[in-house]
Amino acid sequence: MISGTSVQAQDDDRVLAIGGSVTEIIYALGQQDRLVARDTTSSFPPEAEALPDVGYMRALSPEGVLSVNPDLVIAEAGSGPPETIEVLEEAAINFVMVPDGYDRASIGEKIRAVAAALGVDAAGEDLAAEVDADLAEAEAAAATGGTPPRVLFILSMQGGRILASGTDTGAAGIIALAGGENAVTEFDGYKPLTDEAVTALAPDVILMMDRQGDHSAADAELFSHPALSTTPAAQTGSVVRMDGLLMLGFGPRTPEAVRALSAAFDEARG
């Protein structure tokens, strides 16, 4: 696996994009005509969904990837499994894993890495600078909103058990950029919480990925949960839902996500 961008890209390379933010960056760079396929998480822009889908980024099969005959695979960090990457390397396919992170600087690094893998470094510098300036403006505006609301990001509630974000996650990163305070700081990653722990966190806002459907019914069900029913968020009905890729992708659209979340947090403050 090539970590970084030492690949010598060719204009006629058949490129496979793995990871929604990688695909977005390729489109933002104007290099989409080189794409031959994408992974399941690559749902934006909408036209990307017309490309063949080789499967979920963390559960790729060698057969699925090889079926689209790529010369170059550009993947988000965490793509795999490792056994699949080993097979692709043995098949002499260039595999570039781009760095990931959950802050402003990391987005620029990711854009530059994708651009370098494609051999369009200058365009990458321009895009990185444009996104960075836009994000700096959005972040500064979000920081003027007053007392940061305590935000609990819930990844899932399967079986009534709340799986929440701690630190060092995309959710924690976007909450901070948008002027919020992550309610959970006791652990890294995503872990289940006891009902008592959720109640003690006293979140002002519940943040979730938008999975479509009837939100009014979903909100009622959410706040009927014993752990959430007495929280400040339940008392004000403050739940914010956003498309998962927009919110957690950390790519060219992150300034848009920050502005939308900041506005939602302002509304929650009243």
Regions found by a protein language model. Give the residues of each.
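Sec/Tat signal peptide C-region and signal peptidase I cleavage site
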Residues: 5-9
